[in-house]
Regions:
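Internal mixed beta-strand/loop scaffold within catalytic domains of large alpha/beta enzymes
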Residues: 1-50, 117-120, 127-130
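Short alpha-helical segments and helix-capping/turn motifs at coil-helix boundaries
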Residues: 21-28, 88-98, 139-141
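Short, low-complexity, polar/charged sequence segments that are solvent-exposed and flexible
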Residues: 27-30, 57-62, 126-130, 173-176
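Glycine-rich loops and low-complexity Gly/Arg-rich segments
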Residues: 33-36, 62-67, 132-136, 181
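Glycine-rich nucleotide/cofactor/substrate-binding loop typically near the N-terminus or early
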Residues: 36-106, 112-115
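Active-site periphery "cap/insert" segments of enzyme catalytic domains
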Residues: 94-177
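Residue-level detector of conserved catalytic or cofactor/ligand-binding positions
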Residues: 176-184
Length: 185
């Protein structure tokens, strides 16, 4: 499974996404032959990319609790992560944009905390990278659009009401700066 296609671009490399979302992708690989990997992107300059890459994306998940009325106390090595990018370094930003234009990309996942989905008028789309998460997402989506690639599924996991609608509102505000109108549905 080491060379599986990178189907997921994930903004956020914290415990929640790695223990929940990446776990489910790991199970999909094992039980449903999904055959996919996740590329993580650290959402802020101080992040975990170096540590995750030193471990080749592998980490152990401890599952404790109950399932179907039975006690669970399991360990599982998660292997669904291929690498983690630091977009605050020139090469990491380039790699993020390469993944954005990939034919393999199907899903973008995010958890940049409840403070992450905010429109920042000081954020510039020509910055490398844009300073806000919605700005980075706009860069990725616009790059994908210009490359003529198909649409993707967006899973916003931030803990705010209407997280997807709020994120869409921010992205549309950034698109208006480059004179791209909102998509029609």
């Amino acid at each position: 499974m080491k060379n599986a296609p990178e189907k997921v671009l994930q903004f956020g490399e914290g415990n929640f996404l790695r223990a929940f979302v990446d776990y489910w992708f790991d199970l999909a690989n094992e039980k449903a032959d999904w055959n996919g990997k996740c590329v993580l992107v650290q959402p802020i300059a101080p992040g975990l990319a170096k540590m995750i890459n030193e471990q080749e994306g592998l980490y152990t998940l401890y599952l404790r609790g109950s399932e179907n009325g039975k006690k669970v106390d399991d360990k599982r090595v998660i292997s669904s992560v291929s690498r983690c990018l630091n977009p605050y370094e020139e090469e990491g930003f380039k790699q993020m944009m390469d993944v954005a234009a990939s034919d393999d990309l199907e899903i973008i996942v995010s958890n940049t905390t409840e403070a992450g989905i905010v429109y920042d008028p000081a954020c510039k789309l020509e910055d490398v990278p844009a300073s806000s998460f919605p700005g980075k997402l706009t860069q990725v989506l616009y790059h994908r659009y210009k490359a003529g690639k198909k649409g993707i599924i967006m899973l916003a996991c931030e803990l705010i009401d209407n997280n997807g609608k709020e994120l869409l509102k921010c992205v549309n505000q950034y698109l208006s700066l480059i004179h791209i109108s909102e998509p029609t549905r």
